[in-house]
């Protein structure tokens, strides 16, 4: 579960290393985001010659969480850390590669590009 002020790693090659959630999108009093949800983030740490700079604000989709996601069969998919993929204004990934596994819950119409870039889908 991701909430405001949560720090997440970045699972793409956009140039950001760490981002902080500043808003959970979807509803005025929505408090938590889980895998597949879109959040508003600010870049807290970036590499020198990346596509994004420290302090910039982007949309991001949560691809991995420590709390995990429960499947209909009762199994729980859990990860070691929280991670997100940065999106541009058209909700397309900024980076051209996605690092680490992602879950099958991302297989919606608007997020298929992230699933196709990922090396492993759990």
Curated annotation (Swiss-Prot):
Record's keyword terms, sorted: Ribonucleoprotein, Ribosomal protein, RNA-binding, rRNA-binding
Q: Which CDD domains does the UniProt record give? A: Ribosomal_uL14
**Which residue ranges does UniProt annotate as crossing the membrane?**
none
A Pfam family assignment? Ribosomal_L14
List, in alphabetical order, the GO biological process terms annotated in this UniProt record.
translation
A GO cellular component annotated for this chain's UniProt record is: cytosolic large ribosomal subunit
Select a single GO molecular function from the record's annotations and give it: large ribosomal subunit rRNA binding
Its domain of life reads: Bacteria
Q: Which HAMAP family match?
A: Ribosomal_uL14
Function per UniProt: Binds to 23S rRNA. Forms part of two intersubunit bridges in the 70S ribosome.
Assigned protein family: Belongs to the universal ribosomal protein uL14 family.
Q: How does it assemble?
A: Part of the 50S ribosomal subunit. Forms a cluster with proteins L3 and L19. In the 70S ribosome, L14 and L19 interact and together make contacts with the 16S rRNA in bridges B5 and B8.
Protein's UniProt name: Large ribosomal subunit protein uL14
Q: Which organism is it from?
A: Xylella fastidiosa (strain M12)
| Gene behind this protein | rplN
């Amino acid at each position: 579960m991701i909430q405001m002020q949560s720090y997440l790693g970045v699972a793409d090659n956009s140039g950001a290393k760490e981002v902080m959630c500043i808003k959970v999108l979807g509803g005025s009093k929505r408090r938590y985001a889980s895998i597949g949800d879109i959040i508003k983030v600010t870049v807290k740490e970036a590499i020198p010659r990346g596509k994004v700079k420290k302090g910039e604000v982007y949309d991001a989709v949560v691809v991995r969480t420590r709390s995990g996601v429960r499947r209909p069969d009762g199994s729980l998919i859990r990860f070691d850390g929280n991670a997100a993929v940065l999106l541009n204004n058209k909700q397309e990934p900024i980076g051209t590669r996605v690092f680490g596994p992602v879950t099958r819950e991302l297989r919606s119409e608007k997020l298929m590009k992230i699933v196709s870039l990922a090396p492993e889908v759990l």
